[in-house]
Protein backbone atom coordinates (compact mmCIF):
# COMPACT_ATOMS: atom_id res chain seq x y z
CA UNK A 1 0.00 0.00 0.00
CA UNK A 2 1.30 3.47 -0.93
CA UNK A 3 2.05 5.89 1.86
CA UNK A 4 -0.87 8.37 2.33
CA UNK A 5 1.73 11.13 2.15
CA UNK A 6 2.36 10.16 -1.48
CA UNK A 7 -1.19 9.24 -2.55
CA UNK A 8 -3.55 11.78 -0.93
CA UNK A 9 -4.20 14.66 -3.40
CA UNK A 10 -3.42 17.40 -0.85
CA UNK A 11 -0.68 15.63 1.09
CA UNK A 12 1.01 14.81 -2.21
CA UNK A 13 1.49 18.54 -2.95
CA UNK A 14 2.98 19.16 0.50
CA UNK A 15 5.14 16.03 0.17
CA UNK A 16 6.55 17.06 -3.21
CA UNK A 17 7.25 20.60 -2.01
CA UNK A 18 8.60 20.11 1.54
CA UNK A 19 9.41 16.44 2.21
CA UNK A 20 10.55 14.38 -0.78
CA UNK A 21 11.71 17.40 -2.78
CA UNK A 22 15.15 16.68 -4.31
CA UNK A 23 17.41 19.52 -3.14
CA UNK A 24 21.07 20.33 -3.92
CA UNK A 25 23.40 18.95 -1.24
CA UNK A 26 25.46 22.14 -0.97
CA UNK A 27 23.00 25.04 -0.54
CA UNK A 28 24.24 27.41 2.17
CA UNK A 29 22.41 29.47 4.79
CA UNK A 30 21.72 32.09 2.11
CA UNK A 31 19.02 29.68 0.90
CA UNK A 32 17.25 29.92 4.29
CA UNK A 33 15.60 33.25 3.55
CA UNK A 34 12.80 31.83 1.39
CA UNK A 35 11.39 29.85 4.31
CA UNK A 36 12.05 32.79 6.67
CA UNK A 37 9.99 35.04 4.40
CA UNK A 38 7.17 32.48 4.58
CA UNK A 39 7.38 32.53 8.38
CA UNK A 40 7.42 36.36 8.38
CA UNK A 41 4.31 36.42 6.17
CA UNK A 42 2.41 33.98 8.41
CA UNK A 43 3.47 35.96 11.50
CA UNK A 44 2.37 39.26 9.92
CA UNK A 45 -1.01 37.83 8.86
CA UNK A 46 -1.66 36.43 12.36
CA UNK A 47 -0.56 39.51 14.34
CA UNK A 48 -2.34 41.73 11.78
CA UNK A 49 -5.55 39.76 12.18
CA UNK A 50 -5.55 40.29 15.95
CA UNK A 51 -4.74 43.99 15.52
CA UNK A 52 -7.60 44.37 13.02
CA UNK A 53 -10.00 43.05 15.69
CA UNK A 54 -9.36 46.18 17.76
CA UNK A 55 -8.37 48.78 15.16
CA UNK A 56 -10.80 51.36 13.73
CA UNK A 57 -10.05 52.88 10.32
CA UNK A 58 -11.53 56.30 10.98
CA UNK A 59 -9.47 59.49 11.17
CA UNK A 60 -11.07 60.44 14.48
CA UNK A 61 -10.39 57.15 16.26
CA UNK A 62 -7.50 55.41 14.41
CA UNK A 63 -4.71 56.85 16.59
CA UNK A 64 -6.73 56.29 19.77
CA UNK A 65 -7.52 52.70 18.77
CA UNK A 66 -3.80 51.91 18.40
CA UNK A 67 -3.18 53.48 21.82
CA UNK A 68 -6.08 51.40 23.19
CA UNK A 69 -4.51 48.22 21.73
CA UNK A 70 -1.22 49.01 23.48
CA UNK A 71 -2.72 50.02 26.83
CA UNK A 72 -5.93 48.07 27.35
CA UNK A 73 -5.97 44.95 25.16
CA UNK A 74 -4.44 41.84 26.76
CA UNK A 75 -0.93 41.53 25.30
CA UNK A 76 -1.95 44.13 22.70
CA UNK A 77 1.41 45.90 23.07
CA UNK A 78 3.37 42.78 22.11
CA UNK A 79 1.07 42.05 19.15
CA UNK A 80 1.45 45.62 17.89
CA UNK A 81 5.25 45.66 18.25
CA UNK A 82 5.63 42.18 16.77
CA UNK A 83 3.67 43.41 13.75
CA UNK A 84 5.66 46.66 13.40
CA UNK A 85 9.07 45.04 13.91
CA UNK A 86 7.96 41.94 11.99
CA UNK A 87 7.79 44.22 8.94
CA UNK A 88 11.44 45.19 9.53
CA UNK A 89 12.47 41.53 9.78
CA UNK A 90 10.44 40.84 6.63
CA UNK A 91 12.44 43.44 4.69
CA UNK A 92 15.79 42.30 6.10
CA UNK A 93 14.97 38.78 4.86
CA UNK A 94 13.69 40.17 1.52
CA UNK A 95 16.84 42.17 0.80
CA UNK A 96 19.06 39.22 1.82
CA UNK A 97 16.98 36.93 -0.43
CA UNK A 98 17.27 39.29 -3.42
CA UNK A 99 20.99 39.84 -2.73
CA UNK A 100 21.50 36.06 -2.71
CA UNK A 101 19.68 35.84 -6.06
CA UNK A 102 21.94 38.53 -7.55
CA UNK A 103 25.17 37.02 -6.20
CA UNK A 104 24.53 33.43 -7.23
CA UNK A 105 22.79 34.17 -10.54
CA UNK A 106 19.40 32.79 -9.46
CA UNK A 107 17.76 35.34 -11.79
CA UNK A 108 18.33 32.97 -14.71
CA UNK A 109 15.16 31.19 -13.51
CA UNK A 110 13.12 33.82 -15.38
CA UNK A 111 9.57 33.06 -14.19
CA UNK A 112 10.64 32.60 -10.57
CA UNK A 113 12.67 35.83 -10.66
CA UNK A 114 9.93 37.93 -12.30
CA UNK A 115 7.27 36.70 -9.85
CA UNK A 116 9.78 37.56 -7.11
CA UNK A 117 10.08 41.15 -8.37
CA UNK A 118 6.26 41.43 -8.44
CA UNK A 119 6.24 40.07 -4.87
CA UNK A 120 8.80 42.70 -3.83
CA UNK A 121 6.62 45.51 -5.22
CA UNK A 122 3.51 44.06 -3.54
CA UNK A 123 5.21 43.74 -0.14
CA UNK A 124 6.50 47.33 -0.44
CA UNK A 125 2.98 48.59 -1.26
CA UNK A 126 1.55 46.65 1.70
CA UNK A 127 4.17 47.99 4.12
CA UNK A 128 3.61 51.57 2.93
CA UNK A 129 -0.15 51.34 3.48
CA UNK A 130 0.36 49.68 6.86
CA UNK A 131 2.54 52.59 7.97
CA UNK A 132 -0.34 54.99 7.26
CA UNK A 133 -2.83 53.16 9.51
CA UNK A 134 -1.75 54.36 13.01
CA UNK A 135 -2.54 57.90 11.74
CA UNK A 136 0.40 59.59 13.41
CA UNK A 137 2.21 62.61 11.93
CA UNK A 138 4.61 60.54 9.82
CA UNK A 139 1.75 58.27 8.71
CA UNK A 140 -0.25 61.22 7.41
CA UNK A 141 2.60 63.15 5.82
CA UNK A 142 4.22 60.04 4.41
CA UNK A 143 0.91 59.15 2.73
CA UNK A 144 0.53 62.72 1.45
CA UNK A 145 4.06 62.92 0.01
CA UNK A 146 4.16 59.45 -1.60
CA UNK A 147 0.64 59.52 -3.10
CA UNK A 148 1.35 63.04 -4.39
CA UNK A 149 4.22 61.63 -6.49
CA UNK A 150 1.61 60.16 -8.84
CA UNK A 151 0.62 63.70 -9.81
CA UNK A 152 3.91 63.80 -11.76
CA UNK A 153 2.36 61.44 -14.33
CA UNK A 154 1.52 63.62 -17.35
CA UNK A 155 -2.11 64.44 -18.16
CA UNK A 156 -3.83 61.96 -15.78
CA UNK A 157 -1.64 62.60 -12.70
CA UNK A 158 -3.84 65.01 -10.73
CA UNK A 159 -7.03 63.06 -11.40
CA UNK A 160 -5.29 59.83 -10.42
CA UNK A 161 -4.12 61.26 -7.08
CA UNK A 162 -7.58 62.59 -6.21
CA UNK A 163 -9.09 59.24 -7.20
CA UNK A 164 -6.69 57.40 -4.87
CA UNK A 165 -7.35 59.90 -2.07
CA UNK A 166 -11.11 59.71 -2.52
CA UNK A 167 -11.20 63.49 -2.12
CA UNK A 168 -8.98 66.55 -2.33
CA UNK A 169 -6.56 65.50 0.41
CA UNK A 170 -5.53 62.46 2.46
CA UNK A 171 -8.58 62.00 4.69
CA UNK A 172 -11.18 59.51 5.99
CA UNK A 173 -11.75 57.85 2.60
CA UNK A 174 -7.99 57.39 2.11
CA UNK A 175 -7.46 55.77 5.51
CA UNK A 176 -10.42 53.40 5.06
CA UNK A 177 -9.29 52.20 1.64
CA UNK A 178 -5.69 51.84 2.80
CA UNK A 179 -6.91 49.61 5.63
CA UNK A 180 -8.94 47.52 3.15
CA UNK A 181 -5.94 47.14 0.81
CA UNK A 182 -3.55 46.48 3.69
CA UNK A 183 -5.80 43.65 4.85
CA UNK A 184 -6.28 41.98 1.45
CA UNK A 185 -2.74 42.30 0.01
CA UNK A 186 -0.99 39.79 2.33
CA UNK A 187 -3.33 37.08 1.03
CA UNK A 188 -2.46 38.06 -2.54
CA UNK A 189 1.22 37.91 -1.49
CA UNK A 190 0.64 34.39 -0.12
CA UNK A 191 -0.91 33.32 -3.46
CA UNK A 192 1.99 34.88 -5.41
CA UNK A 193 4.48 33.15 -3.10
CA UNK A 194 2.87 29.81 -3.96
CA UNK A 195 3.25 30.58 -7.69
CA UNK A 196 6.86 31.65 -6.98
CA UNK A 197 7.44 28.23 -5.37
CA UNK A 198 5.63 26.43 -8.19
CA UNK A 199 7.96 27.93 -10.80
CA UNK A 200 11.01 27.24 -8.61
CA UNK A 201 10.07 23.56 -8.30
CA UNK A 202 9.84 23.30 -12.09
CA UNK A 203 13.60 23.87 -12.30
CA UNK A 204 14.83 22.94 -8.83
CA UNK A 205 16.99 25.16 -6.63
CA UNK A 206 20.17 26.87 -7.73
CA UNK A 207 23.29 26.31 -5.57
CA UNK A 208 26.39 28.37 -4.62
CA UNK A 209 28.50 27.04 -7.51
CA UNK A 210 25.86 27.83 -10.15
CA UNK A 211 26.55 24.40 -11.68
CA UNK A 212 23.73 21.85 -12.23
CA UNK A 213 23.24 19.77 -9.09
CA UNK A 214 21.13 17.05 -10.75
CA UNK A 215 23.86 14.48 -10.10
CA UNK A 216 23.93 15.22 -6.36
CA UNK A 217 20.50 15.64 -4.74
CA UNK A 218 19.33 14.96 -1.19
CA UNK A 219 15.75 14.90 0.18
CA UNK A 220 14.50 18.19 1.62
CA UNK A 221 13.38 16.40 4.80
CA UNK A 222 15.12 15.98 7.25
CA UNK A 223 18.20 17.88 6.01
CA UNK A 224 16.70 21.24 5.10
CA UNK A 225 13.66 21.08 7.40
CA UNK A 226 16.00 21.05 10.41
CA UNK A 227 18.12 23.78 8.82
CA UNK A 228 14.99 25.91 8.25
CA UNK A 229 13.91 25.38 11.86
CA UNK A 230 17.30 26.69 13.05
CA UNK A 231 16.89 29.72 10.77
CA UNK A 232 13.36 30.28 12.10
CA UNK A 233 14.59 30.16 15.72
CA UNK A 234 17.28 32.75 14.97
CA UNK A 235 14.71 34.95 13.18
CA UNK A 236 12.29 34.77 16.12
CA UNK A 237 15.17 35.43 18.55
CA UNK A 238 16.18 38.58 16.61
CA UNK A 239 12.54 39.72 16.34
CA UNK A 240 11.81 39.22 20.04
CA UNK A 241 15.05 41.00 21.02
CA UNK A 242 13.77 43.99 19.05
CA UNK A 243 10.20 43.74 20.35
CA UNK A 244 11.07 43.27 24.03
CA UNK A 245 14.18 45.43 24.39
CA UNK A 246 13.97 48.16 21.72
CA UNK A 247 10.46 48.19 20.21
CA UNK A 248 10.76 51.77 18.95
CA UNK A 249 14.37 51.57 17.74
CA UNK A 250 13.40 51.45 14.05
CA UNK A 251 10.29 53.65 14.31
CA UNK A 252 9.91 57.41 14.08
CA UNK A 253 9.14 59.42 17.25
CA UNK A 254 6.95 61.74 15.12
CA UNK A 255 4.46 58.91 14.72
CA UNK A 256 3.56 59.20 18.42
CA UNK A 257 2.02 62.58 17.62
CA UNK A 258 -1.52 62.32 16.19
CA UNK A 259 -1.83 63.34 12.52
CA UNK A 260 -2.25 67.08 12.04
CA UNK A 261 -2.78 68.39 8.48
CA UNK A 262 -1.91 71.93 9.68
CA UNK A 263 1.58 71.10 10.97
CA UNK A 264 4.27 69.55 8.78
CA UNK A 265 7.04 67.57 10.57
CA UNK A 266 10.55 69.04 10.02
CA UNK A 267 11.82 65.90 8.25
CA UNK A 268 9.38 63.67 6.39
CA UNK A 269 10.91 60.25 5.84
CA UNK A 270 9.61 56.69 5.38
CA UNK A 271 10.52 53.62 7.43
CA UNK A 272 14.20 52.57 7.21
CA UNK A 273 13.57 49.88 4.59
CA UNK A 274 12.45 52.46 2.00
CA UNK A 275 15.19 55.02 2.67
CA UNK A 276 17.49 53.87 -0.17
CA UNK A 277 14.68 54.37 -2.72
CA UNK A 278 13.66 57.65 -1.04
CA UNK A 279 17.26 58.91 -1.36
CA UNK A 280 17.21 58.11 -5.11
CA UNK A 281 13.85 59.91 -5.43
CA UNK A 282 15.19 63.03 -3.67
CA UNK A 283 18.49 63.12 -5.57
CA UNK A 284 16.77 64.23 -8.80
CA UNK A 285 15.56 67.86 -8.70
CA UNK A 286 12.71 67.11 -11.13
CA UNK A 287 9.43 65.57 -9.89
CA UNK A 288 8.75 63.22 -12.82
CA UNK A 289 12.45 62.30 -13.10
CA UNK A 290 12.56 61.46 -9.39
CA UNK A 291 9.46 59.26 -9.62
CA UNK A 292 10.89 57.43 -12.64
CA UNK A 293 14.22 56.86 -10.85
CA UNK A 294 12.33 55.61 -7.78
CA UNK A 295 10.37 53.02 -9.79
CA UNK A 296 13.42 52.05 -11.89
CA UNK A 297 15.55 51.51 -8.78
CA UNK A 298 13.48 48.38 -8.09
CA UNK A 299 12.28 47.60 -11.63
CA UNK A 300 15.93 47.35 -12.74
CA UNK A 301 15.90 43.87 -11.14
CA UNK A 302 13.78 42.70 -14.11
CA UNK A 303 16.75 43.52 -16.37
CA UNK A 304 19.25 41.39 -14.41
CA UNK A 305 18.96 38.32 -16.71
CA UNK A 306 19.59 40.58 -19.74
CA UNK A 307 22.60 42.23 -18.07
CA UNK A 308 24.26 38.87 -17.29
CA UNK A 309 27.30 38.80 -19.58
CA UNK A 310 29.39 36.20 -17.73
CA UNK A 311 29.93 32.66 -19.00
CA UNK A 312 29.48 31.49 -15.40
CA UNK A 313 26.21 31.68 -13.51
CA UNK A 314 27.36 32.30 -9.94
CA UNK A 315 29.83 34.90 -8.62
CA UNK A 316 31.48 32.22 -6.47
CA UNK A 317 34.53 31.99 -8.77
CA UNK A 318 34.48 35.61 -10.04
CA UNK A 319 36.50 37.94 -7.73
CA UNK A 320 36.00 41.08 -9.87
CA UNK A 321 32.22 40.65 -9.94
CA UNK A 322 32.25 39.93 -6.20
CA UNK A 323 34.04 43.23 -5.70
CA UNK A 324 31.38 45.06 -7.75
CA UNK A 325 28.59 43.29 -5.84
CA UNK A 326 29.92 44.37 -2.45
CA UNK A 327 30.46 47.93 -3.71
CA UNK A 328 26.77 47.86 -4.69
CA UNK A 329 25.84 46.69 -1.18
CA UNK A 330 27.96 49.50 0.37
CA UNK A 331 26.33 51.95 -2.04
CA UNK A 332 22.83 50.84 -0.97
CA UNK A 333 23.80 51.27 2.70
CA UNK A 334 25.06 54.79 1.85
CA UNK A 335 21.75 55.57 0.12
CA UNK A 336 19.85 54.25 3.18
CA UNK A 337 21.85 56.59 5.44
CA UNK A 338 21.34 59.58 3.09
CA UNK A 339 17.58 58.92 2.87
CA UNK A 340 17.31 59.58 6.60
CA UNK A 341 19.31 62.85 6.53
CA UNK A 342 17.91 66.36 5.94
CA UNK A 343 18.10 67.89 2.45
CA UNK A 344 21.20 70.07 2.89
CA UNK A 345 24.89 70.16 2.01
CA UNK A 346 26.82 67.78 1.97
CA UNK A 347 24.02 65.17 2.00
CA UNK A 348 22.52 66.32 -1.31
CA UNK A 349 25.69 65.74 -3.35
CA UNK A 350 26.47 62.43 -1.56
CA UNK A 351 22.94 61.24 -2.39
CA UNK A 352 23.27 62.28 -6.03
CA UNK A 353 26.64 60.55 -6.42
CA UNK A 354 25.37 57.39 -4.70
CA UNK A 355 22.27 57.36 -6.95
CA UNK A 356 24.39 57.69 -10.12
CA UNK A 357 26.73 55.00 -8.78
CA UNK A 358 23.78 52.66 -8.11
CA UNK A 359 22.58 52.67 -11.73
CA UNK A 360 26.13 52.77 -13.09
CA UNK A 361 27.12 49.65 -11.12
CA UNK A 362 24.13 47.61 -12.25
CA UNK A 363 23.93 48.78 -15.87
CA UNK A 364 27.61 49.26 -16.76
CA UNK A 365 30.22 48.18 -14.22
CA UNK A 366 28.91 44.72 -13.28
CA UNK A 367 28.35 43.56 -16.91
CA UNK A 368 31.79 45.00 -17.84
CA UNK A 369 33.46 43.16 -14.92
CA UNK A 370 31.84 39.92 -16.15
CA UNK A 371 33.20 40.47 -19.67
CA UNK A 372 36.70 41.20 -18.34
CA UNK A 373 36.55 37.93 -16.35
CA UNK A 374 35.49 36.04 -19.50
CA UNK A 375 38.52 37.46 -21.35
CA UNK A 376 40.90 36.68 -18.47
CA UNK A 377 39.72 33.06 -18.61
CA UNK A 378 40.11 33.19 -22.43
CA UNK A 379 36.42 32.27 -22.93
Curated annotation (Swiss-Prot):
GO MF annotations, alphabetized: metal ion binding; ubiquinol-cytochrome-c reductase activity
Main subcellular location of this protein, as a coarse class: mitochondrion
CDD domains: cytochrome_b_C (cd00290), Cytochrome_b_N (cd00284)
Residues in coiled coil: none
Binding site for a ubiquinone: 201
The keyword Heme is annotated on this UniProt entry: yes
Residues engaged in binding heme b b566: 97, 196
Cofactor(s) this protein cannot do without: heme b
SUPFAM superfamilies documented for this protein: a domain/subunit of cytochrome bc1 complex (Ubiquinol-cytochrome c reductase), Transmembrane di-heme cytochromes
Binding residues annotated for heme b b562, in chain numbering: 83, 182
Subunit record text: The cytochrome bc1 complex contains 11 subunits: 3 respiratory subunits (MT-CYB, CYC1 and UQCRFS1), 2 core proteins (UQCRC1 and UQCRC2) and 6 low-molecular weight proteins (UQCRH/QCR6, UQCRB/QCR7, UQCRQ/QCR8, UQCR10/QCR9, UQCR11/QCR10 and a cleavage product of UQCRFS1). This cytochrome bc1 complex then forms a dimer.
Family that this chain belongs to: Belongs to the cytochrome b family.
Note: Heme 1 (or BL or b562) is low-potential and absorbs at about 562 nm, and heme 2 (or BH or b566) is high-potential and absorbs at about 566 nm.
Known role: Component of the ubiquinol-cytochrome c reductase complex (complex III or cytochrome b-c1 complex) that is part of the mitochondrial respiratory chain. The b-c1 complex mediates electron transfer from ubiquinol to cytochrome c. Contributes to the generation of a proton gradient across the mitochondrial membrane that is then used for ATP synthesis.
Name of the protein in question: Cytochrome b
Organism for this UniProt entry: Boselaphus tragocamelus
Lineage, top ranks: Eukaryota, Metazoa, Chordata, Craniata, Vertebrata
Amino acid sequence: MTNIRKSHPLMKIVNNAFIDLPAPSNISSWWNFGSLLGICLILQILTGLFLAMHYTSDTMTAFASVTHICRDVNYGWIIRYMHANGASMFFICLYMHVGRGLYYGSYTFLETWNIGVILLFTVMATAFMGYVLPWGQMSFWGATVITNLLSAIPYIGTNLVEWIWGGFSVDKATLTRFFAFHFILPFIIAALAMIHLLFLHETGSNNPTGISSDADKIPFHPYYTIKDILGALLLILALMMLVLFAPDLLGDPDNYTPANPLSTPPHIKPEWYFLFAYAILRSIPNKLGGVMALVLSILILILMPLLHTSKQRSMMFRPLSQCMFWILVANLLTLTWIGGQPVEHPYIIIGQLASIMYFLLILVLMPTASMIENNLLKW
